[in-house]
Amino acid sequence: MKIEVKLPTLGDDANDEATVSYWLVDEGEQVREGDDLVEMTTDKAAFSLPCPQTGTLSEKLVEEGEEVTVGDVLCIIEI
């Protein structure tokens, strides 16, 4: 089963954007629920996005330095 990891709502503005700063996990790597997957930055803050479920990071859909908006799929976790 594949789980899409999406950029969550970052505040009151549904059109929020963030930049992928640094991937903390490589494709093919095992991850546990709650592990940090990627570091993100906005114009107001920096934060890490946690893994929603235990599995394997099968595919990164965005590169470091790319800007994404709320709801965009960042990666796929195979469970």
What are the residue ranges of the model-derived segments?
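Acidic, low-complexity mobile loops and tails
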Residues: 1-39, 48, 54, 60-61
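Short hydrophobic beta/alpha edge segments that flank linear recognition/processing sites
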Residues: 32-50, 69-79
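PDZ-domain C-terminal substructure recognizer with occasional recognition of PDZ-binding tails
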Residues: 55, 60-74
